[in-house]
Amino acid sequence: FKSNGDLYFTDPPFGLPGVFDDSGKAPVQGVYRLSHDGALTLLINDIKAPNGIAFSPDEKTLYVSDVDPKRAAWLAYDVKADGTVADGRVFFDAMRWRKDPFFGPDGFKVDRKGNIFGARPGGISVIASDGTLLGTIETGQPMSNVAWGEDGQTLFMTAGSSIYRLRVTTGADRY
């Protein structure tokens, strides 16, 4: 959610036959905004497998993870005053961690400093707001998502068969 109540969400192709080919998939895998007044808008329609989504702390940048096996990356978009987005770009290339078509950058959260804690095969990447890799949390498993705990400084990380918990020195921007 954006602070004004607008809901931004992705509609990935997961669960459809032929996820990463053209057979049996929905015509658009996109990023949408459901405004607080109920209007639904397709904002981005050129991402093959949009997945995780989050805002920078100042809400001027929208981040989206793309699990496309040919372009696994976290993407960044400028958020305009009217809530639409522009100037999409690769924020961080995650191809080095792609293991197979179903494991690329996945769910993520942004901390109060604007750093991304992003799930990916083998662990979590911590990426600064300028796109620099700050570090990694290696788990050896394909990670699926992260969430902040109630205290805002505990990071929960999910994998296929495990849940990890780690206290971090930074903290949640929002829950």
Identify the residue ranges that each predicted region occupies.
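A detector of repeated loop/turn-to-beta-strand junctions in beta-rich toroidal repeat architectures
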Residues: 24-29, 71-73, 85
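Short loop/turn segments immediately following the C-termini of beta-strands
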Residues: 12-14, 67-69, 79, 121, ...
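Beta-rich, blade/repeat-based domains predominating
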Residues: 1-7, 14-15, 25-30, 40-61, ...
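A short loop-to-beta-strand structural motif that recurs across blades of beta-propeller domains
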Residues: 29-32, 73-75, 123-125, 162
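Blade-level signature of beta-propeller repeat domains, shared across WD40, Kelch, NHL, RCC1
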Residues: 145-175
